[in-house]
């Protein structure tokens, strides 16, 4: 039995109320969901709360899952949305439109690609140092594979703003790594 068939069977068992299937879903996806939430919230307790709430929502709305996307992707979207919702409640996040004129010039000018090897921990530290809006967009796109268009809709900002912030986040990470770990 392949992964998709196994996953689909697990979803169907959950839909029928099989408690063992709920347990299996939780143990299969909890860590992945926690990591996604942590990349947004940067707080273990809040991230754990969002995972719990997300599982409750997912199990309550299991009938709405249509197999158009993967079940794992569906769960990740729920926890990402819950995490962003918590941030909005707490901070009323401010998104500033950024000027796109210099970005094309930077890309065209280019820069020599210095080859560096960094540990996962060094990269995670550099990401954690980003301003919150940079960190969120970088993680959603680069780590959670959410499209830039979808990020724009989630955060209620323009696509070009997402693109610019992502580009600047990458540059800040690169700069941080080169300055810190040369």
Q: What is each model feature region?
A:
Residues 15-16, 53-70, 90:
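Sigma70-family region 2
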Residues 26-44, 61, 127, 172, ...:
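Amphipathic, Lys/Arg- and hydrophobic-enriched alpha-helical face
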Residues 11-34:
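A short, charge-rich alpha-helical start-of-domain segment used by transcription regulators
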Residues 125-136, 144-161:
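Helix-turn-helix DNA-binding module
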Residues 88, 130, 135, 170-182:
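Short, Lys/Arg-enriched C-terminal cap helix and immediately downstream tail that follows
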Residues 63-67, 77-97, 168:
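Arg/Lys-rich amphipathic alpha helix in sigma70-family domain 2
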Residues 3-4, 93-120:
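Internal acidic/polar
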Residues 35, 49-56, 69-81:
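Structural recognition of an alpha-helix C-terminal capping motif at a helix-to-coil junction
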């Amino acid at each position: 039995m392949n992964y998709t068939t196994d996953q689909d069977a697990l979803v169907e068992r959950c839909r029928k109320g099989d408690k063992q299937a709920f347990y299996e879903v939780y143990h299969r996806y909890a860590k992945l969901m926690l990591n996604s939430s942590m990349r947004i919230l940067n707080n273990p307790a809040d991230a754990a709360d969002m995972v719990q709430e997300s599982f409750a929502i997912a199990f309550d709305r299991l009938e709405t899952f249509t197999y158009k996307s993967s079940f794992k992707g569906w769960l990740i979207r729920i926890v990402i949305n819950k995490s962003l919702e918590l941030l909005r409640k707490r901070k009323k996040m401010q998104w500033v439109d950024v000027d796109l004129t210099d970005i094309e010039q930077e890309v065209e000018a280019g820069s020599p690609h210095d080859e560096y090897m960094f540990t996962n921990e060094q990269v995670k530290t550099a990401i954690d140092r980003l301003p919150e809006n940079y960190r969120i967009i970088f993680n959603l796109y680069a780590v959670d594979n959410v499209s830039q268009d979808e990020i724009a809709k989630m955060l209620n900002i323009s696509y070009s703003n997402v693109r610019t912030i992502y580009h600047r986040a990458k540059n800040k990470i690169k700069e941080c790594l080169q300055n810190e770990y040369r």
